[in-house]
């Protein structure tokens, strides 16, 4: 069984036991997070498609880690003008482990 959930403006295909990195959530390591914006549920030969979300379906996940991605270097340059700007950015993320998928009745 798998589900497609929406969080942080992105969509993720999840199943029980899978881990995923999502945009940073306000939760501590070890906390349980409920993702209730389920777009699609697939099990055996049956598929439930939400309009836009599947009513009553949710994913229960545990926060495994709060961290940042590796640094991305941004370098701006204009030739002949001696203009150079260099800066870096590290995007924060939350790593989740899926514990349970709750289906609608």
From Swiss-Prot:
**Can you quote a single GO CC term?**
ribonucleoprotein complex
Record-given protein name: Large ribosomal subunit protein bL21
Q: Which UniProt keywords apply?
A: Ribonucleoprotein, Ribosomal protein, RNA-binding, rRNA-binding
Q: Which InterPro entries match?
A: bL21-like (IPR028909), bL21-like_sf (IPR036164), Ribosomal_bL21 (IPR001787), Ribosomal_bL21_CS (IPR018258)
Family (UniProt): Belongs to the bacterial ribosomal protein bL21 family.
Q: What is the lineage of its organism?
A: Bacteria, Pseudomonadati, Dictyoglomota, Dictyoglomia, Dictyoglomales
> What does the subunit section of this Swiss-Prot or TrEMBL entry state?
Part of the 50S ribosomal subunit. Contacts protein L20.
Tell me which species this is from.
Dictyoglomus thermophilum (strain ATCC 35947 / DSM 3960 / H-6-12)
Single GO MF annotation: structural constituent of ribosome
Describe the function of this protein: This protein binds to 23S rRNA in the presence of protein L20.
Under Pfam families, the record lists: Ribosomal_L21p
- Which GO biological process entries does UniProt record here? translation
Q: Which domain of life is it from?
A: Bacteria
Q: Does the keyword rRNA-binding apply?
A: yes
């Amino acid at each position: 069984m798998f589900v497609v959930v929406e969080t942080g403006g992105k969509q993720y295909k999840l199943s029980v036991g899978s881990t995923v990195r999502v945009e940073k959530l306000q939760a501590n390591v070890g906390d349980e997070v409920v993702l209730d914006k389920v777009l699609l549920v697939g099990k055996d030969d049956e598929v439930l498609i939400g309009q836009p979300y599947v009513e009553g379906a949710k994913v229960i996940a545990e926060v495994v880690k709060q961290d940042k991605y590796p640094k991305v270097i941004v370098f701006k340059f204009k030739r002949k003008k001696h203009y150079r700007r260099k800066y870096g950015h590290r995007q924060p993320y939350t790593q989740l482990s899926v514990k349970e998928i709750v289906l609608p009745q």
